[in-house]
Amino acid sequence: MKRKIIVACGGAVATSTMAAEEIKELCQNHNIPVELIQCRVNEIETYMDGVHLICTTAKVDRSFGDIPLVHGMPFISGIGIEALQNKILTILQG
């Protein structure tokens, strides 16, 4: 089953692209079919239907119902990337 993931940042360009590429590679390496949607943080609600995970590189102080939310800055900084990858895999494989 294809997993639908929203990757959001402030402008839907630079940091969300980096995070999306990391997530795409992670999923390919673990044979997880994925559909990635890049958007701005303020557009997340537009794309939430059927989503399995939301990853933001900007600070978000709210929840999105039952959809898990992870902070994607480790994909940008490189600090804590393995822990984030493990968390994403746990969510998507669960």
UniProtKB/Swiss-Prot annotation:
What Gene Ontology molecular-function terms does this entry list? protein-N(PI)-phosphohistidine-sugar phosphotransferase activity; protein-phosphocysteine-galactitol-phosphotransferase system transporter activity
Q: What induces it?
A: Constitutively expressed.
The PTS EIIB type-2 domain sits at: 1-94
GO terms for CC? cytosol; transmembrane transporter complex
User: Could you tell me what reaction this enzyme catalyses?
Assistant: galactitol(out) + N(pros)-phospho-L-histidyl-[protein] = galactitol 1-phosphate(in) + L-histidyl-[protein]
The record's InterPro entries line, in alphabetical order, gives: PTS_EIIB-like_sf, PTS_EIIB_2, PTS_EIIB_2/3
Give the main localization category: cytoplasm
Query: What is a biological process (GO) this protein takes part in?
Result: galactitol transmembrane transport
Q: What is this protein called?
A: PTS system galactitol-specific EIIB component
Organism of derivation: Escherichia coli (strain K12)
Q: What gene name is listed for this protein?
A: gatB
